[in-house]
Amino acid sequence: FMVIADSGEAEIVFCTSCDYAANVEKAELFPLEAQEEAMLTKEEVVTPDCKTIADVCAYLKLPVDHSVKAVAYNSEKGLILCFVRGDHEVNEIKVINTCGVIDLEMATEEQLAAAGTVGGYMGPVGIDNKKVIVVVDATVMKMHNVCCGANKEGYHFINVNPGRDFTPTYVADIRLIQEGDPCPHCGGEVSKARGIEVGQVFKLFTKYSSCLLYTSPSPRDMRRS
């Protein structure tokens, strides 16, 4: 339960058209539809010194929302490669929940090299999803003819099509909600604000009642915790 306040430590989103509100880490999103395009032939292109989405798109003269951004994490289950649209950000809480891991830390260059990729040029094409967990945001799976890393220094692919050119381990909503995104309840636009947490609900089951030896009668007058 949140109260909007400029001094709040948490960031929340709320819909301007309905009563939907959520912490940004928990806010759900539906995949954004992309304009239909005929699939083009995948090409590998040289992209020297282009390790960021902004640099790659400027060099290739492509809109950022036609690119795919990669973020790599290490976990107790091994390497996790996450892919979202170029103008989106990865929501780590959603990745943890999707993959069923306890925690994430940024992957090292050594771990990336062992998986057959390199920082700044990571992409889903050619990655063995039996050795590496590949998580692709649902919006990416609806895109066509996108640009992504070619998993080697100084190269990217263009005209990559999800499903045809790569198969992920998981397809899920893993992106961080942004101001102006469509509300998951009514389709209206969401806005952002700071908030203070004034209450929270936990599923504690019998954790405390068992410790306190508390019992209550059942409908049949049986004693149970």
Language-model segments: residues:
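Extended, low-hydrophobicity, polar/charged segments
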Residues: 2-216, 220
